[in-house]
Curated annotation (Swiss-Prot):
Belongs to the HrcA family. It holds the Pfam family HrcA. InterPro entries: GAF-like_dom_sf, HrcA, HrcA_C, WH-like_DNA-bd_sf, WH_DNA-bd_sf, WHTH_transcript_rep_HrcA_IDD. Keywords: Repressor, Stress response, Transcription, Transcription regulation. One of its GO terms (biological process) is negative regulation of DNA-templated transcription. This is Heat-inducible transcription repressor HrcA. The keyword Transcription regulation applies. It comes from Synechocystis sp. (strain ATCC 27184 / PCC 6803 / Kazusa).
């Protein structure tokens, strides 16, 4: 059973050193190695005791009994959120390097995306994934709510391309005692209200819609509205999108984490056959700014240094935080690029959880900023 552990300075230092050493070597880390290579000013036995406490807390684990420790997904999460820092100067250096690689040429944007993918794969050693700008999006044409005998509400959604989607949601508890005729009349009124609010809107516009204001106008439908939002989003995400730019696969499959054929096959299947699932994960504006890793809020807890809010928000999903099982051995680092505050696409790097986070995160952040600046000039 995992026991909670309040990390003191020593725990933080040993966890940071363990993660960094494992990232660099891909070899389990023992107390003797840490005592020799890092200046902790404590004995090997003290380090060994701290490693045991970190393991009990679920931040490290042993691949087998006689081995050293390696970071768990939770260990990487603590490392990324609390122990990893970099300065504005480092970010400026990364951006300058990207601009030098692009050579300041007057690229067409599609060619720039291809080139940026090559650069990110080359600099990181991982897979670069960039979505093309989403200029054409599916819009909601009509919404209808119907009462079912099972005290559920049938939602029928029709897009501007006349694609139909249906789903059921539970009737709000506050309405269960009402008569059937009264319910049907109220649902008709609510349907008309929702059509007036949502008709003609695409996913980007719905993402910026004040759903809280809708909750206030029809407070008894608050939970229903949350469910409705989740039903609408996947439908409107079926975009008329350009191809997903993918570079760097050959480098990643050389990593020790992908030494087994089955692991390589799962990764290739994800990139070749599950792009629809991957696309919705890469480009969902609502996912950026959630609690997965809002850099500028959580990255510098130890130093107190904050990042400018104007930077692209970088989302980091580590291991099992990824909803697709084929991505559980991986970390996905993503940021949205924009045109005048409108989300247009995303820049991502996909690699093993044993990722050089200190290098990868600024790369994604600054690549998104470069693409946003390029779009603003068009």
């Amino acid at each position: 059973m995992v026991k909670p552990l309040r990390l003191n300075d020593r725990h933080q230092q040993i966890l940071r050193a363990t993660v960094q050493h494992y990232i660099a070597t891909a070899e389990p880390v023992g107390s003797h190695t840490l005592a020799q290579e890092y200046q902790f000013a404590v004995s090997s036995a003290t380090i060994r005791n701290a490693l045991g406490q970190l393991e009990k807390a679920g931040l490290l684990y042993q691949p087998h009994v006689s081995a050293g420790r390696v970071p768990s997904d939770s260990g990487y999460r603590i490392y990324v959120d609390n122990l990893l820092t970099w300065s504005d100067r480092q970010s400026r250096t990364v951006k300058q390097r990207l601009e030098n690689e692009i050579n300041g040429d007057n690229w067409h944007f599609e060619a720039l995306i291809q080139r940026m993918g090559q650069i990110l794969a080359g600099l990181s050693g991982y897979i670069a994934l960039i979505t093309f700008p989403q200029t054409e999006t599916v819009q909601l044409r009509h919404l209808q709510l119907m009462l079912l005998p099972s005290h559920q509400i049938l939602i029928i959604l029709v897009t501007d391309s006349y694609h139909t989607h249906s789903a059921t949601l539970d009737l709000p508890a506050a309405m269960e005692a009402k008569e059937e005729g009264e319910l049907e009349q109220e649902l008709a009124i609510f349907s008309n209200f929702l059509n007036a609010q949502l008709r003609g809107k695409n996913l980007s516009e719905l993402s910026h819609l004040n759903w809280q204001e809708l909750d206030q106008k029809f407070s008894i439908y608050a939970d229903f509205l949350k469910g409705l939002q989740q039903q609408i989003k996947p439908l409107l995400q079926r975009r008329m999108a350009g191809p997903l730019v993918v570079h760097g696969v050959s480098k990643v499959i050389q990593q020790p984490e992908f030494s087994q054929l089955e692991q390589v096959q799962m990764l290739l299947s994800l990139l070749e056959q599950e792009q629809d699932k991957l696309f919705s994960l890469l480009f969902d504006p609502d996912n950026y700014g959630d609690n997965l890793a809002n850099l500028g809020q959580e990255m510098n807890l130890l130093t107190g240094e904050t990042m400018p809010k104007t930077r692209p928000v970088v989302t980091i999903r580590i291991g099992a935080e990824n909803p697709l099982e084929s991505m559980h051995p991986c970390t996905l680092v993503s940021a949205i690029y924009r045109q005048q505050e409108i989300p247009m696409g995303s820049v991502s790097i996909l690699g093993p959880t044993r990722m050089v986070y200190q290098q990868t995160i600024p790369l994604v952040e600054q690549a998104a900023e470069c693409l946003s600046e390029a779009l603003s000039k068009n």
